[in-house]
Amino acid sequence: MVSVGVHVSIAGSIDRAVSRATERGCDTFQIFSRNPRGWSYKPLTDDSASVFIKAMQESGIGPAVVHMPYLPNFASEKENIYSQSVESLSVELSRCATLQIPFLVTHLGHHGPLGKEDGRRRVADAINFALEDAPEGVFLLLENTAGEKNSVGSDLADIGDIIGKIQDQQRIKVCFDTCHAFAAGYDLRTHDLVGETFDRFDSEIGLDLLSVIHLNDTKGILGSGLDRHEHIGLGQIGEEGIRSILHHPRLRSLPFIMETPEDSTRDDIGNIAKVRELAV
C-alpha cells in the first residue's frame, strides 16, 4: 500500500491541519507553516506546537511536510530579496524543528540577469548560510521546477550541481514534482518513459536522495514550461503514467503528496481514492 496525501490548510490553528488530513483519509500531508504569500509571520508558541505534536501522535499519520512560502528567491541578484530569502529559510527550518516535522520542501528561485551558473551558486550559498545554525532533525528538500523562464532547478543536473556545492550535504534531500518534470520535458506517460526519467534522476542526483513525490497530473503538454496541476489521471501524464510512477520499485515506499485542484470534477478525497485505485 502506498502512502498518499494532499496539501491541507492550517486556517484557524496549525493543529487543525492534522484533523483536515485525517478527514480526507491521508497517510501523509503537506502544509505551509504560515501565510505563504508574505514575508511576515507569527512566531509559533510552545502551546500551539505541543498541540500539533500531540495531534500528530494521536493521528498515526505521517510524515508531515512543510512547504516554503512563495516569495523567497535564493537565486535573486537583489540583495534585499536574497537576504530576506535566507532569513525565511532559516525561520522555516526552525519552525519545522519546533513542530517535529522532518521535511521542508523549497523551490530554488529565478536567476534573472545573473545566468544559470551564478544562479546555482547563489542558491547553494543561501542554503549554506541557512544551514549553519539550523537545528538538527530537519531535512531540506530541493524541488524541481517546471522550466519557467530563468528558473533554477528544472534540469535535474542543475539540482545535482547545487547539491555538490552544499557543505552539509547530509541535510539535503529532493522532492520530485511530476507536473513540473513533465512541463520541463521529462516524459512520464508510460512505464518505459518513467523508468528512463528516474534512471536519469539516479545518474544526475541519486535516487537515495529522493524523499517525497509531489504527485500531480498536468494541464500543459510535454516541455511546455506550464505549471498547471490537473486531477490525477485526467491530465497529460494520464492514468498509465501515474500508475507507472506509483509502481516504480524505487518510489513505491515514498510519501506521495498531491497538490491537485478541488472543484466540481473531483475533490481531495476523490484524488486520494484515484491514487489508491491506480496503486493496486
Show which residues each predicted segment covers.
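N-terminal pre-domain/capping segments
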Residues: M1-M68, P72-V91
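Active-site beta-loop-alpha junctions enriched in small/polar residues
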Residues: H7-A11, R34-P36, P69-L71, G109-H111, ...
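Active-site acidic/histidine proton-transfer and metal-coordination neighborhood
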Residues: E58, F74-K173
